[in-house]
Amino acid sequence: MNPAGALKAVPSIVLAGGGSAGHTSPLIATADALRRIDPTIEIIALGTERGLETRVIPEAGYRLELIPPVPLPRKPTPALFAVPGKMLSSVSAARKVLDEAKADVLVGFGGYVSTPAYVAAWRRKTPIVVHEGNAVPGIANKFAARYCTQHVKTSFPGTDLPHAEYVGLPIRRAISTLDRAALRAEARQFFGLDPDAPTLFVTGGSQGAQRINESVSGAAADLQAAGIQVLHAIGPKNTLEVPQTGPLPYVVLNYVDRMDLAYAAADLVVCRSGANTVTEVSGVGLPAIYVPLPIGNGEQRLNAKPVVDVGGGVLIDNAELTVDWVRANVPQLLLDRERLTAMSTAATGVIRTDADDRLARIILDVVRSAS
């Protein structure tokens, strides 16, 4: 609601979230869904200079406003004493953005930017919608769900938040409508892959993952010998040299902007199990070996659990993923067409893939109710 209490002819919506693709991807997917419903809606994204949002939000065609980041230490450290001052500065900056936008609603996706945005919106009496991406909620969204709003939406059923309603995780329309088989030939040509060879896609998420990079690349010769080609996204700041030991390519990229093509090219993926990755991979029916990030609240293991429980994926602890494990297990799985087909069938439909439209409609309903 704007301060005057009247719904403007063109709603103004501020979306707060940043840091990693886990926050920016659902934000962009939601913005796209809002624009499909009403192309005139004013959409402003709120982020910090530290995150992926400084690149991907403008590339997606949305206005981005930056506020100072306020990392919240998980354990008592001297940095904790600086938090109140930083928070006041960041809340003030967020309030300025909300005021200038005449925001009708704030939608928060978590991350450093969300806590000050929630406080600023609450003080301004602007309606707040929280979307929690992980099975285990983060600090910012816990705070907002408890103190700031009753509009709390989650990516997974059973997430422990007050007022939680399961809607799923918004993902890009290019992913949710992907026909992997129809796009496979184009996708493999795009990445310079053989059109027919069994294909492994490897990704550690938007920042890459050293353990995954080292374990899979260390088994490159064995994968080649088994007749397997590899598409490996190593992360924007990482380097990796893999000797070409056979006729099939081992393609190394820092970042994949066309994830739809990467999923279409692949028969199997080795990946982390962030909420966005699990939703996209299972949504397109791609069999997966999930390697949960071994830090945080243990949310990545829980994110993958619904898919793994029905047989759509395999879960392996980060510490257990080694070169020897890859040699012993990946070729065996990737060359078993019957099992891959069963995994693909099992994964499809486990997790909702229409959350972008669902969340967009909820946001607009909140705006209408507040008017």
Question: Which role does the model predict for each range below?
Answer:
Residues 3-4, 332, 352-371:
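C-terminal alpha-helical cap of glycosyltransferases
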Residues 339-353:
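A short, well-ordered alpha-helix in the C-terminal region of glycosyltransferases
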Residues 124, 264-266, 282-291, 310:
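Conserved donor-binding/catalytic loop of nucleotide-activated donor transferases
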Residues 10-21, 40-91, 167, 319:
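Conserved nucleotide-sugar phosphate-binding/catalytic loop shared by glycosyltransferases and other
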Residues 46, 51, 56-60, 183-189, ...:
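Donor-nucleotide binding loops and adjacent catalytic segments primarily
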Residues 122-185, 190:
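Active-site-proximal region of nucleotide-activated glycan assembly enzymes
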Residues 93-106, 114-129, 142-147:
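Glycosyltransferases and closely related glycan-assembly transferases
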